[in-house]
Structure formats: structure tokens, C-alpha cells
Amino acid sequence: MAERKAYVERNTLETQIKASINLDGTGKARFDIGVPFLEHMLDQIARHGLIDLDIECKGDLAIDDHHTVEDVGITVGQAFSQAIGDKKGIRRYGHAYVPLDEALSRVVIDFSGRPGLQMHVPYTRATVGGFDVDLFQEFFQGFVNHANVTLHIDNLRGTNTHHQIETVFKAFGRALRMAVELDERMAGQMPSTKGVL
């Protein structure tokens, strides 16, 4: 089996990012981004998706976190697109429900080749530890646009904003794991009647 790994560098006037990914990893993660809450959430993707992630980012954090969060999403999306290749033999679809105390979230993903995001998270607070939680919409939009996936995110209940977000990212990791997993019964076939994704 060919290695499903990727390394992406993305440099703009706002951020300089290096990201490496291994879709068939063990959940190892290393981050040097400068936004601790984002790093905590990315760790959920790695550990629950069994995806190795290594991300370094130097961003214009003196302004705010916006460019860093969005551009990390873009770069991770690009890395996924490279690592997954032609998509032959993958399950394509993934979904997960994840609870954390009072919070419950559902994430459904399709490696369809068609970018689309539906994200419904009724945050109970605007910030967690000084982090603007609205920025996660930018992270996921960046990911979707560059991984070329359809992604539905729903927080079904929750009163603690940290729990709401953490269940989203854990479910996202688990849905990714399911979708990118190779299906022996597919025997390298394209998971689409069109023959292309």
C-alpha cells in the first residue's frame, strides 16, 4: 500500500505554515501555532482520527487569531487532499456522534470533490479562554474548500461552550477516520458511480 502522507508549506504576508500529515498514523501530534485552544482542538482530530499531524505556524497574532486559524484550516485541507490521492478504495463517507458530559455533537463528511459546509453550533458564550469561538467556522470553511469535502456539523445540545467545541472536533476526527479508511471490499475501486471524485 502506498503511503498516504503529505507535506504542505503555505506562505502569505499573514501566515507562514508547514504541515505534515499521515492518514494511516497512530494519532501522534505536534503543534507550534501560538493559539493554545486551537492546538487543543487539533489534538482531538489527531487522537480520535488516528491521524498523525505536525503543524508549525507563524502568524500575525499581534492583530488577532483570525488569519492563523483560517489559514491552518486551509493548509490542513490541502494536506488531506494530497494525502488521500485519487480516493480509490476509501470509504468516502464518515460520521460520528460524540458526547462530553451535557454536550453532544454530530459530524458527517463526504469526500465528494464538492466543497460545502453546513455548521450549526449555538455557542453559549462568545469566547473560551480569550479565544473567539466564531473563528472555528473559518477553520472548517478553509478545510472544506481545500480538501474538497462536504461537511455537516451539528451541536445537538450543550451548555458549556468548551464542551460544545470539543465534541465537534472529536466527532470530526472520528468521521475523518471512517471516511479515509481503506475498504478491502472496494479493492481499489472509486467509491462513486461517476468513476471520479
UniProtKB/Swiss-Prot annotation:
One of its GO terms (molecular function) is imidazoleglycerol-phosphate dehydratase activity. It comes from the Bacteria. It catalyses: D-erythro-1-(imidazol-4-yl)glycerol 3-phosphate = 3-(imidazol-4-yl)-2-oxopropyl phosphate + H2O. Pathway: Amino-acid biosynthesis; L-histidine biosynthesis; L-histidine from 5-phospho-alpha-D-ribose 1-diphosphate: step 6/9. The keyword Amino-acid biosynthesis applies. Pfam families: IGPD. GO terms for biological process: L-histidine biosynthetic process. It is found in: Cytoplasm. It is an enzyme of class 4 (lyase). PROSITE patterns: IGP_DEHYDRATASE_1, IGP_DEHYDRATASE_2. Its EC number is 4.2.1.19. The keyword Transferase does not apply. One of its GO terms (cellular component) is cytoplasm. Keywords: Amino-acid biosynthesis, Cytoplasm, Histidine biosynthesis, Lyase. Belongs to the imidazoleglycerol-phosphate dehydratase family. NCBIfam families: PRK00951.1-1 (NF002106), PRK00951.2-1 (NF002111), PRK00951.2-4 (NF002114). HAMAP family: HisB (MF_00076). This is Imidazoleglycerol-phosphate dehydratase. It comes from Pseudomonas syringae pv. tomato (strain ATCC BAA-871 / DC3000).
